[in-house]
Swiss-Prot record:
It comes from the Bacteria. This is C-5 sterol desaturase. It is an enzyme of class 1 (oxidoreductase). Its EC number is 1.3.-.-. Belongs to the sterol desaturase family. Its main location: membrane. Residues 94-227 form the Fatty acid hydroxylase domain. The chain crosses the membrane at residues 3-23, 68-88, 91-111, 147-167. The lineage of its organism: Bacteria, Bacillati, Actinomycetota, Actinomycetes, Mycobacteriales. The keyword Ion transport does not apply. It comes from Mycobacterium bovis (strain ATCC BAA-935 / AF2122/97). It is found in: Cell membrane.
Length: 300
């Protein structure tokens, strides 16, 4: 079975071109309330968009490789460990697959924002200061975490190909929520589904928006598990530490490099583990006495 994402690519490109064309008059820089320059709403920056599209093209190949690797494990789990095998011809099997993938995506996505090693695979998607359809294509190249997260699905008896198909459908749905061109939708839809308004919050680096709205298709997971945040104002997009590069290799690997640097700088095993498995931005709680004394002197 061919990946549904491949069939969706022409639609992705068409929507991207239409949005980019509409944004040509909006590429001037506006001044935010903080006095700092920021991209205008709905704007595109050519170098930023080229980087996003390039990462998306590479991710097609890397994702195919990860799926091929996962297929071996999923097939073995489905054939030898699953207590039963669900029929792909039953409608409820598709419901289980799509909802199951979405719930596990929420779980993985939340972990990816709270565990630095996994954040390193995901941060590239958040590295753009623009929020548009090109940003949707700024995908990671390391899907190992998702593959491990979805192991329960073939163990439940879902055919491996159906798991992959549901994964692709989840990804396709998420494309259209990466836009500032769509305001809020009807209340019932906003209550149940992930929407552009919800996902703008997720990409915001403002303190009130950090680590919120992890849902892929359904936003009800965020409402149930306490991570929902409504859109109160236009977010500032990007990472809390600005990334001054459009090099796609550096965008994908920068956090891994930072982890290695912090690991080497730490002198205690506890601190090293914190730098790897703690949340992004984690720092040791204890301060060297000499540094503390120096801080005390300078504070005077």
């Amino acid at each position: 079975m061919r990946d549904p994402v491949l069939f969706a690519i022409p639609c992705f490109l068409l929507l991207l071109i239409l949005e980019w064309t509409a944004a040509r008059k909006l590429e001037s820089i506006e001044t935010a309330a903080t006095g700092q320059p920021r991209p205008a709403s709905g704007a595109y920056l050519t170098r930023d968009s080229v980087a996003s599209i390039s990462m998306g093209l590479v991710s097609i190949a890397t994702t195919a490789g990860w799926k091929s690797l996962a297929l071996l494990g999923y097939a073995a789990i489905y054939a030898y460990l699953a207590p039963w095998q669900l029929s792909a011809h039953r409608w409820y099997t598709w419901v289980i697959a799509i909802v199951g993938v979405d719930l596990l995506y929420y779980s993985y996505h939340r972990i990816a924002h709270r565990v630095r090693l996994i954040w390193a695979t995901h941060q590239a998607h958040h590295s753009s200061e623009y929020f548009n359809f090109a940003t949707a294509l700024r995908q990671k190249w390391n899907n190992s975490g998702e593959i491990l997260m979805w192991v329960p699905l073939p163990l439940m008896g879902l055919p491996p190909w159906m798991v992959f198909c549901s994964w692709s459908l989840n990804l396709i749905y998420q494309f259209w929520v990466h836009t500032e061109r769509i305001d809020r939708l009807p209340r019932w839809f906003e209550f149940v589904f992930n929407t552009p308004s919800h996902h703008r919050v997720h990409h915001g680096m403002d303190p009130v928006y950090l680590d919120k709205n992890y849902g892929g298709i359904l936003i009800i997971w965020d409402r149930l598990f306490g991570s929902f945040q409504p859109e109160l104002f236009r977010p500032h997009y990007g990472l809390t530490k600005r990334v001054d590069t459009f090099n796609i290799w550096k965008l994908q690997t920068r956090e891994y490099v930072a982890i290695v640097r912090d690991w080497r700088s730490a002198t205690r095993l506890r601190d090293r583990l914190g730098y790897v498995f703690g949340p992004p931005g984690w720092e040791p709680r204890t301060i060297d006495k000499s540094n503390a004394a120096a801080s005390l002197v300078t504070s005077r």
